[in-house]
Amino acid sequence: MNTILICDDDKDIVSALDIYLSSEGFATLKAYDGLECLRLAESNPVDLILLDIMMPGLDGIRATAKLREKYNVPIILLTAKSEDADKVLGLNIGADDYITKPFNPIEVIARVKSQLRRYTSLGGKNGGGSAGDPALLTNGGIVMDDGAKVVTVDGEQVSLTPLEYNILLLLMKNPGRVFSTSQIYELVWNDPSLGSENTVAVHIRHLREKIEIDPANPRYIKVVWGLGYKMEKA
């Protein structure tokens, strides 16, 4: 059973999300501020976090940054329509997705299940590669063991979020091929690409920071201006 940590200072929202998720067979943990969220994540196995942006004390943006220092579990931000800048900031610091309030229960469940599929496919709870998957991908100093879901760069293991891993996997499997931002979004997020350029760019920037010696002058993930991104053969 997957465990979802719900964090929002509005107790009615937490209660509603608890009902939606419990009805789908998920276990839940409930927090009402950012600090309580961090404490629960530290002391309990958690598979996904639903995290409100606007909270007193430690808000969702700062909580996301602190969570990303230790954990790779998917984080879905809960936002208001007026918080567009915060959505971008949240994605910049490591959130995987966001849901705009007021939300539809069906959308919440669909997004939670989508993120969990990615997480478990990358070796999260009950996860792991299938026996028929290509076990090892290499390019220059990058070694990607897709069976163990481990990435090393120049012999050092790097920690990637599920979305970063899947972007890298797509590019590593197709060295030299140019993918548009729309193609990357649709193949990795499994959703239609609607205004996804900034979302993809943010995740690729984070990925470069983890695998490139000089992210400003990347050796591996190259931009092809006006077309998209490719994995340079090294």
How should these model regions be labeled?
Residues M55:
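Receiver (REC) domain active-site loop signature in two-component systems and cognate sites
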Residues A65, E69, P74-T138:
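Basic, amphipathic DNA-recognition helix from helix-turn-helix-like DNA-binding domains
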Residues V150-Y220, V224-L227:
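Positively charged, aromatic-enriched patches within helix-turn-helix-type DNA-binding elements
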Residues D8, D52, T79:
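Active-site residues of response regulator receiver
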Residues Y32-E36, D59-R62:
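Acidic catalytic/metal-coordinating carboxylates
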Residues T3, S114-V178, S182:
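Short, Lys/Arg-enriched segments at the junction into DNA-binding effector domains
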Residues N44-L50:
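Active-site beta3 strand of CheY-like receiver
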Residues G25-Y32, L40:
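Short hydrophobic/Thr-rich beta-strand motif most characteristic of the beta2 strand and flanking loop
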